[in-house]
């Protein structure tokens, strides 16, 4: 999915226009998506695609909800993304599909706008039985979070998987282990690029920093 470092200047992306279409055209040529996914990607930077029968990826363009983006108005549904999201999840629910949700700037984190946080949380509540997991970036930190209602009932769960950017830490990434039948996440393994060893040996040195089942139990 599209991140805030994918544009220049950073964080800036206009609503559908000749400038945004230029970027989306490049992504169209780079990402291997189906025809319908490429169509919505070209228009608004968001898409959905089946990975296999009954297992769907839904990806949003969170740059439209970045409060550092000076080219957008916060209180409107830019590129009809929320309408598309609701329609997509409704169809997935009717078809009994499992949805993995991906985005860059998570609601109520980083630079997410209040408009995004409010509307997204309502959608998560509505489709909590369809969206199995959320996967986010942007924070440059390894973390996870839960969404709870006023009665402390959990209605959604999300992962933030670190960053390859070496800002005050080693570049890091994550590999997930999942059940192919249920699509449950069974474990994940977090890796880092050891820059100290890489510089010493002039070879990329990757080691496992931890795995979830051993660390969290």
Map each language-model feature to its residues.
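Active-site neighborhood of phospho(di)ester-bond hydrolases with catalytic His/Asp-centered motifs
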Residues: 1-3, 100-104, 127-145, 158-162
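Divalent metal-coordination and catalytic microenvironments
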Residues: 3, 60, 85, 101, ...
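Metal-dependent phosphoesterase/phosphodiesterase active-site architecture
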Residues: 8, 16-91, 95, 141-217
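Short, electropositive alpha-helical surface patch
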Residues: 12-26, 112-125
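Active-site-proximal segments of metal-dependent phosphoesterases and phosphodiesterases across multiple
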Residues: 64-83, 90-136
């Amino acid at each position: 999915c599209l991140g805030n470092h994918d544009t220049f200047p950073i964080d800036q992306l206009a609503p559908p226009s000749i400038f945004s279409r230029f970027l989306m055209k490049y992504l169209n040529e780079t990402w291997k998506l189906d025809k319908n996914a490429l169509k919505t990607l070209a228009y608004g930077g968001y898409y959905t695609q089946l990975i296999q029968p009954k297992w769907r990826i839904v990806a949003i363009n969170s740059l439209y909800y970045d409060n550092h983006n000076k080219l957008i108005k916060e209180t409107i549904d830019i590129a009809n993304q929320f309408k598309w999201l609701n329609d997509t999840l409704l169809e997935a629910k009717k078809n009994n599909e499992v949805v993995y949700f991906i985005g860059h700037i998570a609601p109520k984190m980083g630079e997410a706008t209040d408009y995004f946080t409010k509307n997204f949380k309502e959608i998560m509540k509505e489709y909590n039985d369809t969206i199995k997991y959320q996967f986010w970036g942007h924070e440059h930190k390894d973390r996870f979070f839960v969404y709870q209602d006023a009665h402390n009932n959990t209605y959604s769960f999300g992962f933030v998987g670190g960053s390859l950017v070496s800002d005050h830490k080693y570049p890091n990434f994550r590999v997930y282990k999942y059940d192919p039948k249920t699509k449950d996440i069974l474990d994940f393994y977090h890796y880092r690029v050891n820059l100290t060893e890489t510089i010493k040996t002039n070879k990329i040195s990757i080691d496992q920093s931890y795995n979830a089942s051993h660390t969290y139990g």
